[in-house]
Amino acid sequence: DNKDFSTDVRYVSTPQGIFAVGPNFRVHPTTARTQSETPIIRHPTNSNIMFASANTYNVGGTTTFSTACYKTTDGGVTWSGSDTTVFNFGDPAPMIMHTGRFLISYITSTGQMGASYSTDLGSTWSGVITFPGSTTSSDKNLSAVDGISTSTYYGRCYTVYTEFAGAYTNRIVSTY
């Protein structure tokens, strides 16, 4: 069963065959918060640098929902960061540009799609940049950077998301 936290490899039988599911682990060890939707990306020119993010929820005390940001500079041996970097509605989508700038898109505290960036490996973050045209019903974002150095759009960051209200109701919207 893939719903429970486990440190064991699990095997899932599907019509396509049997697949091994690696064990769960916390990117940033903590006992007071959950971590879900945890994408991890690697720096395009330094494979020892990785940037991860997660939805976090305080399971004791206050009911704070947040986006967490974690980084490693030693290939994943150790991680640092915060479970409460940006207070919002989650759905983190991390990116690292070829310049080393970290970016993360997420659902803002108003329900719109937005992003923040860091120029110091995630130690400090910009304020929220809200995407033009995003309504209070934005969801399901995915972000990426054009990493092809010969591309006309090299270094451009893209986010696609679903808009559930406004002029783009039930459409997938792209922004860069």
List each language-model region with its residue ranges.
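C-terminal PAP-associated
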Residues: 1-176
